[in-house]
Amino acid sequence: MEQSLMEKLTILADSAKYDVACTSSGASRAAKAGSMGSCYAPGCCHAFTADGRCVSLLKVLMTNCCAFDCSYCVNRRSNDAPRATFSPWELAELTIEFYRRNYIEGLFLSSAVLVSPDYTTERMLKTLRLLRNEYHFGGYIHAKAIPGTSPELLEQLGFLADRLSVNVELPSESSLKLLAPDKGRHSIFRPMKQIAVEGAANREELTLYRKAPRFAPAGQSTQMIVGASPETDHHILKLTEGMYQKYSLKRVFYSAYIPVAEDTRLPALDTKPPLLREHRLYQADWLLRFYQFKADEILDADHPNFNPYLEPKCNWAVQHYGLFPVDVNRASFEMLLRVPGIGPKSARRIWHARKQASLGLDELKRMGVVLKRAQYFITCRGFAGAHPGRGSAGRERITSALIDPTVFSGGVEQLSLFSPPAVDKLVAQGVPTHAAQKLVREEAVQCLARAL
């Protein structure tokens, strides 16, 4: 029986929920006369823009009928699930109707592999050509490039979309071979390299010809599944660092693995998604991009996984406590960035303000420094650094100031990094959740104090 448009939308929007796209668009194309939509300062997928607005997009698959059989994917060939496929005309018209009703401001288009990567990409191209050329849609479009797509089709896709992304999926080639045998390292990184090279060439061309067509003006991103394979956090972070450097990625997204199938190669169906691990990866990713950290400084062979109780930056400060305290009136900008409680904005404010006058605690507080954390790592005018005291009491005071409160306030599910979760174990023994969180926090503080 032929499916209605609403039935297709229900199936294909649900199938797209595992794709991550929570980011601002990064494009700055203004609206033109006779066109619909604008890319000026917006974001996508319920993201908050710099001016505080929350914008949305239609996130949907072209089809969930897949020729590949990736064991971790809900759309894999062997999965017994409802299937649907949009025609290019249906999807283009649906996007425009949603836009006219002010439901969305853009489109996030991905797809399972229907017949072959090239055949699927050709259908995506037809959809985007209809939107751009027939409907004159000027809004944000994020297109997922299919691994294995020919360079010619990928180039055409880049001139129609604002952002492209090729999902890495898994952190190592061995995991790809085990869990996604239809995909290979070359089929993923070749299009990544092409997007980076063509993007750089296009930017050069735009300096000479302002009206030259723009190739993926918002750059490229990728997504990695965390928890489906045995790689360490250090391995994942090194891969992330390499991709940022080699392929000029705008973002790397991390997705905590949600079990969707019973398979001996994958975690059991009752395994909770490693949400805390995903959160730590985003924090470390931020350090790579904005705090001038290297992956090997955050984690190493001796400490290959994140500390569940401390944010990566605080964990680094604890491990290198001998470098502190630093004088904020003399320290380098790079060292200011490494002080817990000081971020890029407050570091820049300190850097400029101290040229005019020596800074004290009052000035630092007005600049946004979180003194609860920073006080143990800095000195300034009239302040010789907080003295937490000697022995275990002093160490516990520092640890209590640094410990990540979200680990305990987020509930039992946030602790899914542990095996078994400490809070979960106490709750199973009859201890109330709030009391269990308090006990685990106290134990964590004592353990971290001993590490100091």
For the regions a language model picked out, list residue spans one by one:
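Conserved C-terminal portion of the radical SAM core fold
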Residues: 172, 187-264, 273-299, 370
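Residue-level signature of tetratricopeptide-repeat
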Residues: 353-354
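Flexible, acidic/Gly-rich N-terminal and inter-domain linker regions that tether
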Residues: 1-65, 370, 378, 386-409, ...
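Short Lys/Arg-enriched helix C-cap and helix-to-coil transition segments
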Residues: 362-366, 375
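Conserved Radical SAM active-site core
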Residues: 1-68, 72-222, 226-230, 261, ...
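Long, highly charged, low-complexity intrinsically disordered interaction regions
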Residues: 265-337, 373-422, 426, 451
